[in-house]
């Protein structure tokens, strides 16, 4: 006599066919008696096809903005290493001095409060040392293409920029409120944490339309990374964890407002091109402003370097 086990944890080698009522092997989509296809097998096959279509359409999208950001970050880092003077290789390894960082637009709270608001944008693209830019570049390389494919290049750039600004604002508020000394602050980590915030809220907001395996992979891949990085930020004193938290919150809130670009949606639109152009103009304008006020810092840097050289001679 055939009897199904009532314990869900017990492996069931047989199932009851919905059509003929006879036992048939569970791993076979068709009943061995009446050849009818299991409804569960049909549903599973439909879900598998939908997931394959979703992933094919998603990964067919290019990710030019992520690569452009990586190139800009690296180019600015190398340019700072040259402008800082001295041994370029040493500057690349150790990073530029404080005055060079400020000249290129690093965040200094007093200067931001004095009206140099462009210093909430420029720090997103400059870095303090080799390990700093290497770790941020790696993180962006991992998560950036996924977010850009999900949201499209225009929305992705907007999310990245606004999350970075949000991180800078919370860092400013936190340091001023805590009366902490203000040194040069820079790096893409606030914007990258914003992307972590995006993926967290995205996986919940669209949980009903995302393929289950894809949604599970997102949670298992990125949630531990977020927790570990926030923990590291609280244990190492020179890390601006307020910028990380600010970026994370900004990215999460923006995801509630900005819809993602479904795989069957049009990739490029006029609004998207306008968005990219506006973001690019904001970035260019911010660095232009930084250049216009950079001379005093670069002159002071040269003066100090000359004084050190005279002493050594």
Where are these regions (language model features)?
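Alpha-helical transmembrane segments of multi-pass membrane proteins
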Residues: 69, 73-80, 142, 199, ...
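N-terminal TM1-TM2 helical hairpin plus the immediately adjacent luminal interfacial "cap"
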Residues: 66-188, 235-239
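Hydrophobic transmembrane alpha-helices
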Residues: 144, 198-205, 251-259
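Hydrophobic alpha-helical transmembrane segments
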Residues: 10-24, 103-111, 131-136, 163-168, ...
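Alpha-helical transmembrane bundle and helix-membrane interface signal
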Residues: 149, 202-219, 259-271
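C-terminal transmembrane module of polytopic alpha-helical membrane proteins
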Residues: 1-61, 230-313
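Hydrophobic faces of alpha-helical transmembrane segments in multi-pass integral membrane proteins
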Residues: 139, 158, 162-166, 170, ...
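Membrane-interface micro-motifs in multi-pass membrane enzymes
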Residues: 182-203, 243
């Amino acid at each position: 006599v055939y009897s199904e086990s009532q314990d869900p944890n017990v492996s069931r080698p047989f199932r009851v066919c919905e059509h003929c009522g006879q036992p048939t092997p569970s791993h076979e989509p068709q009943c061995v008696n009446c050849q009818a296809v299991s409804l569960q097998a049909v549903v599973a096959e439909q879900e598998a096809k939908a997931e394959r279509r979703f992933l094919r359409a998603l990964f067919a999208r290019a990710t030019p903005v992520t690569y452009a950001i990586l190139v800009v970050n690296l180019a600015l880092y190398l340019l700072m290493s040259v402008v800082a003077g001295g041994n370029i290789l040493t500057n690349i390894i150790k990073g530029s001095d404080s005055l060079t960082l400020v000249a290129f637009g690093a965040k200094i709270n007093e200067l931001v409060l004095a009206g140099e608001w462009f210093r909430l944008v420029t720090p997103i693209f400059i870095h303090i040392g080799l390990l700093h830019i290497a770790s941020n570049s790696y993180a962006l390389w991992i998560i950036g293409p996924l977010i850009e494919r999900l949201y499209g290049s225009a929305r992705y750039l907007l999310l990245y920029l606004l999350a970075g600004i949000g991180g800078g604002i919370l860092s400013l508020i936190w340091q001023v409120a805590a009366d902490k000394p203000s040194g040069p602050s820079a790096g893409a980590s606030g914007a990258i944490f914003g992307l972590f915030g995006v993926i967290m809220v995205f996986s919940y907001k669209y949980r009903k339309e995302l393929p289950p395996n894809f949604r599970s992979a997102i949670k298992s891949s990125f949630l531990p990374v977020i927790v570990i990085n926030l923990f590291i930020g609280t244990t190492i004193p020179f890390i601006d964890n307020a910028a990380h938290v600010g970026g994370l919150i900004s990215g999460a809130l923006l995801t509630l407002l900005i819809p993602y670009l479904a795989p069957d949606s049009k990739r490029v639109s006029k609004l998207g091109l306008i968005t990219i152009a506006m973001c690019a103009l904001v970035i260019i304008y911010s660095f232009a402003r930084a250049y216009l006020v950079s001379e005093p810092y670069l002159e002071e840097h040269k003066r100090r370097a000359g004084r050190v050289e005279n002493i050594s001679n």
